[in-house]
């Protein structure tokens, strides 16, 4: 198993604003420049799936495993002999909203998918989270 996390605390957004940003999957490409498109049919809730196409990559099916409004969500992407879990946690603190993103890869070929996909995601988290905060602050 391989896991990495990134956290930042900010007063620029509320948990409701950041939640609204993430729950609107079909508009992720407006603030995430690494995504060509994302399509969720149905609501942002446990058990639903969405399709995401990273720029320069193939379509990826993502399943929502846990969804707790304004607090956290966990999704999974299934690769050949591996799974990548992406957990987003939103915690109110006296210093502001703590935003945490945890990427975990498990499975027989996890080392391969870490190299091909997960490491790039983790390396871009600081900039990506700043873009999320910027976009959510306008909601």
Name each region found by the language model.
Residues 1-42:
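Hydrophobic ligand-binding cavity/cleft-lining segments
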Residues 47-52:
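Secreted/surface-exposed cysteine- and glycine-rich disulfide frameworks
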Residues 55-98, 104-109, 134-135:
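Hydrophobic-ligand binding "helix-grip"
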């Amino acid at each position: 198993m391989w896991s990495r996390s990134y956290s930042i605390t900010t007063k620029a957004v509320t948990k409701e604003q950041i939640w609204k940003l993430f729950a609107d999957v079909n508009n992720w490409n407006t603030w995430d420049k690494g995504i060509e498109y994302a399509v969720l049919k149905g609501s942002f809730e446990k058990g639903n799936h969405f399709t995401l196409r990273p720029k320069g990559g193939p379509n990826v099916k993502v399943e929502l495993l846990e969804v707790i409004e304004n607090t956290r969500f966990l999704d999974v992407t299934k690769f050949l002999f591996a799974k990548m879990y992406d957990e987003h946690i939103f915690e109110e603190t006296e210093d502001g909203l703590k935003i945490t993103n945890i990427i975990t890869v498990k499975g027989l070929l996890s080392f391969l998918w870490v190299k091909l996909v997960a490491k790039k995601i983790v390396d871009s988290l600081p900039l990506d989270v700043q873009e999320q905060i910027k976009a959510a602050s306008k909601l």
